[in-house]
Amino acid sequence: LGIENQQKVHYAMPLRHMVGDAFSYLKEYNELAVQNKKQKNWRNSDEFLSGLTAEDRLHPMITICIYYGEKEWDGPRSLIDMLKVPERFQALVSDYKMNLIEVRNSEYLKFQNSDVSIVFDISRFIYDKRYDKINDIYKEQLIPSELGLVIGAITESQKLIDDAIKLEKEGGKMNMCKALEELEEKGRI
């Protein structure tokens, strides 16, 4: 599993994912080929030539881009989106799809880890300026200061970061509603 954290849109991300995944596959292929060569696992010239036996399989590589920028992702989502291909040739061109998770459009995602849900929810609500929603859901709920630090970093709120660091040193938890009220009053969100 590969994770790419992006705060800015990267207009070559599908290509970057493809190359990274290809290098991972190539590394595993080379390791298998060396092992097969040492053990002389070849049953025929096809296996000898390819370096793999007919039964050899590589492990799947899954790469996910987590985009936490404030603006909507407007970059390509697959390799074909990056190419100038006449329509009549598009069916012949190999495509490579990128797995993209946008924090600001993550309401449809369900996470098993409640901390991840909190980070995505609060960050998304801050981006959408839906402070009322944060108040409705997280009213009086204390969250670990580490989560406040992550939310502050994602939303580029220095005040949230500073508050989280201060509370971290004191071993405390954060009330996001109170922290956001202070920020909203000061116009710093």
Describe every region a protein language model picked out.
Residues L1-I189:
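Elongated, amphipathic alpha-helical interaction scaffolds
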